[in-house]
A protein has these predicted regions:
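Membrane-proximal intracellular helices of multi-pass ion channels
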Residues: 1-348
Length: 348
């Protein structure tokens, strides 16, 4: 079901924009309520067909590679579905920890691939290589992964037999967290504070827009960073006219407004959720990471809910709050929040 859910959410999101003319027309058109689905119906059908082909092809390729590595068929299917949909449900208590190095490396690669904007794959299939390589989001995505993995490797190298094992474990956990898959090969809850902090920051970061991953998304963070840079520039040059651009194209005021509103709502949900579950009297790290990991659809957190823990410790009320966070995060906040508006129910 999480394999179907991963693709279902992706198609639902991308049916809200014209794929061919827009190529990831800046995050918010792809991930917030936008153009009428009816007007886009012909493109929606062709888009869904292309996306399903890419999604299924990557999933089949992963299953084959896992089988070649000696993983049983049932395990391969479960692992591939969990990786593709970034659901991360494992059939073993140690997640992916007991599988071979080959299996772990293959899953690492495919977790990262499923976190890439699927529009990039479409551009590659249509041989628009230069346009695909110009994607600021994808370049930033890979930069964050590599930089984070290298920093963690340096920080945890003393915990492993050699630096290569530390590097492999770092890349696996970074790939798992940033794509919101949630697999684990080791108890990173025991890692040094620096490494755990990096993983928490990656939980917020999330994968690319138009992927099966969750989180805030790289594109939103890029737009926010560009917005801050623009404001600083205007402080120095009040009369300057400076436009925010993504992939060489100017970003509209509507997109920036939607991005800012998303972040405000996101922070409000985080603050409210932490406050409510704090009545369970668990430590701040447990409460904070519980909210962050559920809202971003990652899975494991830190402290009492690390890779070897679970959410069974929370009260029924807290579980309801965290369940709401999971649904809201997976649906990009606004679709589920609309259900709480009186105007929504007056239409039925």
């Amino acid at each position: 079901s999480h394999w179907i859910g991963g693709m279902g959410v992706l198609v639902f999101i991308l049916t809200l924009l014209p794929l061919a003319g827009g190529y990831h027309m800046n995050l918010m058109k792809a991930e917030s309520p936008g153009p009428s689905v009816g007007k886009l119906l012909p493109k929606v059908q062709s888009t869904a067909k292309i996306l399903y082909k890419i999604y299924i092809a990557l999933t089949v390729a992963l299953i084959i590679l896992l089988l070649l590595g000696g993983m049983p068929l049932y395990d391969s299917l479960c692992a591939a579905f969990g990786t593709a949909g970034t659901g991360g449900f494992g059939i073993k208590s140690d997640s992916m920890g007991s599988y071979s190095l080959y299996i772990q490396i293959v899953i690492t690669i495919f977790m990262i691939l499923f976190g890439v904007n699927f529009n990039v794959y479409f551009l590659l299939l249509t041989r628009k290589f230069s346009q695909a390589l110009k994607s600021e989001e994808v370049r930033c995505y890979f930069f964050v992964i590599i930089a984070s993995a290298l920093m963690i490797t340096f920080n945890v190298r003393h915990l492993f037999d050699n630096v290569w094992e530390a590097l492999q474990q770092a890349f696996f956990q970074v790939g798992s967290i940033i794509t919101t898959t949630g697999y684990a090969t080791t108890d990173f809850n025991q890692w040094p504070a620096v490494s755990r902090t990096i993983l928490v920051l990656l939980t917020f970061c999330g994968a690319c827009a138009g992927s099966t991953g969750g989180g805030i998304k790289i594109s939103r963070l890029l737009l926010l960073a560009k917005s801050v840079r623009k404001e600083l520039h205007l402080y120095l040059h009040p009369n300057a006219v400076k436009k925010i651009k993504m992939d060489g194209k100017a970003v509209s005021h509507e997109v920036m407004r939607a991005t800012n509103i998303y972040m405000i709502v996101y922070l409000m949900i985080v603050a409210t959720s932490i406050f409510i579950i704090s009545f369970d009297e668990f430590d701040l790290v447990t409460n904070f990471t519980a909210v962050v990991t559920t809202l971003n659809n990652v899975g494991p957190g830190l402290s009492l809910i690390g890779p070897t823990g679970n959410f069974g410790i929370f009260s029924p009320l807290s579980k309801l709050v965290l369940s709401f966070d999971m649904l809201a995060g997976r649906l990009e906040l606004f679709p589920i929040l609309i259900l709480f508006l009186r105007e929504t129910w007056k239409k039925f």
